[in-house]
Amino acid sequence: MTNPLWGGRFTTSSNDIMKKINESISFDQALYEEDILTSIAHCKMLVNQKIISKYEGQLIIHGLEVIQKQIESGNFEFSTDLEDIHMNIEYSLKKMIGNIAGKLHTARSRNDQIATDLKLWIRKSIKKLEQQLHKLQSTLLNIAENHYDTIMPGFTHLQIAQPVTLGHHLMAYFEMLKRDRSRWQDLYKRMNQCPAGSAALAGTSFPIDRHFIAQELGFDSPTENSIDAVSDRDYIIEFLSNASICIMHLSRLAEEIILWCSYNFKFITLSDNITTGSSIMPQKKNPDAAELIRGKTGRIFSSLNHILIVMKGLPLAYSKDMQEDKEPLFDAERNLILCIEAMNSMLNNITINSENMLKAAEHDYSTATDLADWLVKHINLSFRESHEITGQIVKLAEHNKCKIHELTLTQLQKIIPSITEDVFSVLSAKNSVTSRTSYGGTAPINVLQAIKNGRIYLENTD
């Protein structure tokens, strides 16, 4: 038997290998809700334009609603012989209401149908991601507020650089997630044009109303060019690009969590309910959730690479290659949401070891920059001169195996005679962070203001 929906030109049916490589219902059934929404909007338009009768439209819409309930209750049998979600639904509709079902496909193609379905699905996914990122930002704010003045070492090159506060450090990730959310919002606006009614590629001779379908489905307008409408997958590429940037941010935080809970750092302790053990080493408590976030980052990156490679050589308009757009999209979205949830769970199940953070912040001459700044302010040196002198003082402390503030004033005056005892006031980690009051700096008073601004942002974007 040839395919019941496109087999008129064929005398034999597809062989098993062709069916196997051609089917997409095994994964595009995830689009059933969007496909039915698109079909209902298209059907309403056909009725409004008197292309089909009101009675026919009612039959079709009722049938589609029944099919949706069947799918959601698990009572719908998908068939690989029918290739994809569109044909599975249409064939089931035909069995239910007869040949009238065939009128639903008037003035449309699977090409514009799938493009519309995918945009609807991505819009829904953006809303889910926004909700999850909002929760994660709220968690970061809560921890930052509890630790707005908790001192920890700031790092460059993974070497202790300057003291900062944990609240300030976590608010850096809050800002990253703000940018991530902004990118999702920008994508939503840019992609919110409706491909429905573009048909295969050239539009249609039927007197359709594309503006009606666009409005019915919540789009801002119809797409402007029918060829572009069915061949465009920019919105998938942008979605995966945004997902890649977002998961990269999560991966950086995951890497820090892995470091911080290690024996060498001991900055944090992860709860048992978000860690795992070893099958051979009974003492182990592994940060597997963080490691899996880090690992899944490569998986999401590869999804973006996948679709870029698929699209790079395709002539206009539609090619079957584009069927390969869905699995990486669905996989990336599913894993990104899981990673956001896992990160949120980890952060809600950590204990901050503040004393260890402070001890680490006081090591490796972390206040050397404060000393250099003091020399500029009080001895009237250029920063380059103070940098050179501070380097000599650090070298002296290293030679004496002590911290800078443990050097005596006499020892310091051998390097720079005009230095006074006031210099010791800037050499503690606490005084260092308190002094960093420049806009966006790590001073606790700044962190509290940033947290306040963050809460206003979350209220306005809830």
Swiss-Prot record:
Gene3D superfamilies: Fumarase/aspartase (C-terminal domain) (1.10.40.30), Fumarase/aspartase (Central domain) (1.20.200.10), Fumarase/aspartase (N-terminal domain) (1.10.275.10)
InterPro entries linked: Arg_succ_lyase_C, Argininosuccinate_lyase, Fumarase/histidase_N, Fumarate_lyase_CS, Fumarate_lyase_fam, Fumarate_lyase_N, L-Aspartase-like
Pfam families given in the database record: ASL_C2, Lyase_1
Catalytic activity: 2-(N(omega)-L-arginino)succinate = fumarate + L-arginine
Keywords from the UniProt entry: Amino-acid biosynthesis, Arginine biosynthesis, Cytoplasm, Lyase
Pathway where this protein functions: Amino-acid biosynthesis; L-arginine biosynthesis; L-arginine from L-ornithine and carbamoyl phosphate: step 3/3
Localization terms from the record: Cytoplasm
Source organism superkingdom: Bacteria
Top EC group: lyase
Keyword Amino-acid biosynthesis: yes
EC identifiers of the protein: 4.3.2.1
Entry GO CC: cytosol
MF terms in GO: argininosuccinate lyase activity
Biological process, per Gene Ontology: arginine biosynthetic process via ornithine; L-arginine biosynthetic process
CDD domains associated with the record: Argininosuccinate_lyase (cd01359)
PANTHER family per UniProt: ARGININOSUCCINATE LYASE
Family: Belongs to the lyase 1 family. Argininosuccinate lyase subfamily.
Family matches, as HAMAP family: Arg_succ_lyase
Protein name as catalogued: Argininosuccinate lyase
Species annotation: Ehrlichia ruminantium (strain Welgevonden)
Organism lineage: Bacteria, Pseudomonadati, Pseudomonadota, Alphaproteobacteria, Rickettsiales
